[in-house]
Amino acid sequence: MIAKHVPMRSIKKSDFAELVKYITDEQGKTERLGHVRVTNCEANTLPAVMAEVMATQHGNTRSEADKTYHLLVSFRAGEKPDAETLRAIEDRICAGLGFAEHQRVSAVHHDTDNLHIHIAINKIHPTRNTIHEPYRAYRALADLCATLERDYGLERDNHETRQRVSENRANDMERHAGVESLVGWIKRECLPELQAAQSWEDLHRVLRENGLKLRERGNGFIFEAGDGTTVKASTVSRDLSKPKLEARFGAFTPAEGGEAPRRREYRAKPLKTRIDTTELYARYQSERQEMGAVRKGELDTLRRRRDRLIEAAMRSNRLRRAAIKLLGEGRIAKRLMYAQAHKALRADLDKINREYRQGRQAVQERTQRRAWADWLKAEAMKGDDKALAALRAREGRSDLKGNTIQGSGEAKPGHAAVTDNITKKGTIIYRVGSSAVRDDGDRLQVSREATTDGLDAALRLAMERFGDRITVNGTAEFKERIAQAAAAGRLAITFDDAALERRRQELLTKEQAHEQPERNDGRRDRGGDGGIRPAAARTTLNATGGDGDRRDARAVSAGGTVALRKPNVGRIGRKPPPQSQNRLRALSQLGVVRIAGGAEMLLPRDVPGHVEQQGAEPAHALRRGVSGPGRGLKPEQIAAAEKYVAEREQKRLNGFDIPKHARYTDYVGALSYAGTRNVEDQALALLRKENDEILVLPVDKATVQRMKRLAIGDPVTVTPRGSLKTTRGRSR
């Protein structure tokens, strides 16, 4: 776990509202924005919260410092603390920095390899209007992180605070941009030689051989590379600071003599990895130069257009003033007309400048120069396999952990339908409904709200990538859900885990037995080799199409037995329900146009008033019995539940501190009573899961009256019939 302050280089550019917009922007990605939380604010929507905080900041007119504090809390790859833990960590860190009573907005992000929280804090106290600047925040954050890791069982990180700001920035450059910094290059290439120098002459010689120069700057020394990049000597090593060097060699002596032959020199280029990125980096530099030329040309065009429009507006204003001067009106009338002309000119100039600023911003965003890692990410999103391999070869990349799926065979390239994002470490995030599947090249992971569709998509992707032999790692609950998804999807896979494979086969057998067709007399038909064939299989079904062709509606199975193409049908000869008559099931053609006689003509009086809203008649011969909660719900009950869930989810996305809501389906686990609601005269019961998610279950009014005896937080369970039951054993 790492917590760090992200300072603004320019105080004038600091803006609380813009920071909140950035951290709460989904950017068109499903797997980016998680829970958004607002603390110590009276407003209920994000725009109102931003206005409230900005008003508080404007109340302090004395301070000229940055009034916004941007805090970033990041967790190790694979760590997924629950919502309650994240809230507790945020509260304790903010309190440790002295911001417990300050206004703040936080957002959880899932679009990288590391779960992280952005926290935008107002440094102005909401009631005292005083500014608070944490003293030695880096030390306080290091101590807080160490304590929180111990209290919540998180993986330990190195919280050494001896690194300087410049060294941290160099590390960030290498980690995020993927480009070698001057500090890192000197440490890797020539630091031992510099430390072994015995005099100023030896030191200058080593520097010249490596394309560096030693210069005095202020009270210390700097190293300067051939491209003008500089770094403090003490940042590279404390042994190279000015006091240490003068204590060893005496007073500083500048370099003398001409240029010496260089063995190597620093150039900003990608960090060395296990694959060669020379061609990719050449493409990157070429596109970067082209983008710079395009940007310069478009900005020049916008600038010339703005100047022409301004000149035209000024010329029009001069003509207007000249016309006013020639008028024979009085002084007061002319003064009013001059004022109107000036006001019109100001409006025109403001419009021209506003359009110019908007156009310039659009050009800058479209032609923005990307860092090396960002360019690789963009190319990988376009389908460049070489760029994706370069991302996955970066140093510090870790494998996916937790609930994962992988294969024993060699990984083959494969892509799902929708790619939501690709991280800077080469992890592809595929969008699957409300969940997502992560792919690091070696294994797959279903992340965030692992739905049945997400598990099924992960298994199918694993089959495409690794073959039919799959290895599943994770919790027992995850393995059980994987086995259920494999059985429900009839996937032709085999699990390496013998127990899991037996469970899959058991579930598959139950699924097949459950779907075996039944006879009209209630007994199951038996079929297969050596058994009694069903009557439907012994009878030849012929259907006549529109052209008179006769088609056999039977199919021969691999074992030689006759199998119906249409499962779950009743006994042959039984008249199908009305909505199933004259359908095209298993028929090539069907004549549907005929001339009806006069006695069969449909007249207006024969058409019921609700003809456009007629529903399907029940066809119980083709249906299986429905069991479990939700059975027999009326359409208005379902509509009311869905309306309430949609309304609460929209408020949650708008920044309200509201837990996730969903309709109750077939959840099995601990639940607690969270109250009742009435929507469109329909009663809804609210049930809280262990992760604070609220499940909405429609109930009747009699059940609502009985539920009034319950208190908020009482444990309840949902019976298969859809009623509520407390731990005391009394049905509610």
Curated annotation (Swiss-Prot):
InterPro entries this protein is in? Answer: Endonuclease_MobA/VirD2 (IPR005094), LPD7 (IPR040677), TraI-like_C (IPR054461), TraI/MobA_relaxases (IPR049751), TraI_M (IPR054462)
Q: Name one Pfam family in it.
A: Relaxase
Would the keyword Acyltransferase be found if you checked this record's keyword annotation?
A: no
Q: Where is the composition biased (Basic and acidic residues)?
A: 508-528
| Record key words, sorted | Conjugation, Plasmid
What exactly does this protein do?
Answer: The initiation process of transfer DNA synthesis requires the interaction of at least three plasmid-specific components (TraH, I, and J) at the transfer origin resulting in the assembly of a specialised nucleoprotein complex - the relaxosome. Site- and strand-specific cleavage at the transfer origin is dependent on TraI and TraJ.
Q: What is this protein called?
A: Protein TraI
Taxonomic source organism: Escherichia coli
